[in-house]
């Protein structure tokens, strides 16, 4: 009798994706982040569902309902903080996952890579709208500032902003629609993740050497299921340390003040995972230019495959490109720091230099280093 795992129409799909999947024998811990992102998404959907049962998307009661969740709902505080800090874990895994893709040349799987970029944009949009929901000072002013950026679009900008707001300012209509979008988007993310996985399994996974591994494959289960569980335990450990010991470490104190349209906070800044893009936005004095730079800071990932000049796939054996990659990582950390600083000297200058370096490294230095390495190897 055929094993039900291999014959049942539905279980067969799961089997071919997670159990009998042929995987390269040498993929490292950097390949763990895909499964960790799946776990983060499930965690966010579950905690979000329980929060939505008690949350009210009305400007008069939103802030109070979040307080009510933390004070009166059974274990509401832990659900709320797991959701808030789970988003931070989600982005840590996302950045690691994208970084690994760039380092090991996974962007040569163009369909998988492009769906991944779409996923990144969707997750960022979801996180932004989620930040607005508690209706604290930073929620309100963050929503006002970021949505206002769309007014920089020529001709249709102002109409577009008012259409998104549902009025002439960020108000009840804005909060209600942001809640609706924040609820539906994670399910769209889950569907996109399935497409992402589908495209990946068409080609098979990349590996640290960047070579074809068809001649040396091992089953995903038990080897990589066990390996992924180790990563999962470390992720849960980090999350729970954050939630139980310093849940507000990554938040903003201003968000514990109810939203007040008449009082602007001294420094409006988004959550830490958007600070690098926010720093790039602020480094350009022109509004439209800043918005374009902001979008391009993420969209630039789409042209990374076109800028791949090296005849080797990954950076495993390319020291020059490795140096540039870690320069880029250091640059992004600098931008993250600058995004949280006030707009004054010397932070403005540092931000502008770091923004120029970000685009210069990806668009010019990395393709040149690939060509130099080809020449050094006489290829």
Swiss-Prot record:
Keyword Membrane in record: yes
Ligand binding (heme b b562): 83, 182
Topology in membrane: Multi-pass membrane protein
Electron transport as UniProt keyword: yes
Residue sites binding heme b b566 per the record: 97, 196
Coiled coil: none
Pfam families the UniProt entry points to: Cytochrom_B_C, Cytochrome_B
Name this polypeptide is given: Cytochrome b
Species lineage: Eukaryota, Metazoa, Chordata, Craniata, Vertebrata
């Amino acid at each position: 009798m055929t094993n039900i795992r291999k014959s049942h129409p539905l279980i067969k799909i799961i089997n071919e994706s997670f159990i009998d999947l042929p995987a390269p024998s040498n993929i490292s811990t950097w390949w763990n982040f895909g499964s960790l992102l799946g776990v983060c998404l499930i965690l966010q959907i579950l905690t979000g569902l329980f929060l939505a049962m008690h949350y009210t998307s009305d400007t008069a009661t939103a802030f109070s309902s979040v307080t009510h969740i933390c004070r009166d709902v059974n274990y509401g505080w832990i659900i709320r903080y797991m959701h808030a800090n789970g988003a931070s874990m989600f982005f840590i895994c996302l950045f690691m996952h994208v970084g690994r893709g760039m380092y090991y040349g996974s962007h040569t799987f163009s369909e998988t890579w492009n769906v991944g970029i779409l996923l990144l944009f969707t997750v960022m949009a979801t996180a932004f709208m989620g930040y607005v929901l508690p209706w604290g000072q930073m929620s309100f002013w963050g929503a006002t500032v970021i949505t206002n950026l769309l007014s920089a679009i020529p001709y249709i900008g102002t109409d577009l902003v008012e259409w998104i707001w549902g009025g002439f300012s960020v108000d009840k209509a804005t909060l209600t629609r942001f809640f609706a979008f924040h609820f539906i988007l994670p399910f769209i993310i889950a569907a996109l993740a399935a497409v992402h996985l589908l495209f990946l399994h068409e080609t098979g996974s990349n590996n640290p050497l960047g070579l074809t591994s068809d001649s040396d494959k091992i089953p995903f289960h038990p080897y990589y299921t066990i390996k992924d569980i180790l990563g999962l335990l470390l992720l849960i450990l980090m999350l729970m340390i954050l939630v139980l010991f310093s849940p507000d470490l990554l938040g903003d104190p201003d968000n514990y003040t109810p939203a007040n349209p008449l009082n602007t906070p001294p420094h409006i800044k988004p959550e830490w995972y958007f600070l690098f893009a926010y720093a790039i936005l602020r480094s350009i004095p022109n509004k439209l230019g800043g918005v374009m730079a902001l979008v391009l800071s993420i969209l630039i990932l789409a042209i990374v495959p076109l800028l791949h000049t090296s005849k080797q796939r990954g950076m495993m054996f390319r020291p020059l490109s490795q140096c540039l990659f870690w320069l880029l990582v250091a640059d992004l950390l600098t931008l993250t720091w600058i995004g949280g600083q006030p707009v004054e000297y010397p932070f403005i200058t540092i931000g502008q230099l770091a923004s120029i370096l970000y685009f210069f490294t990806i668009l010019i230095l990395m393709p040149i280093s690939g060509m130099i390495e080809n020449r050094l190897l006489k290829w």
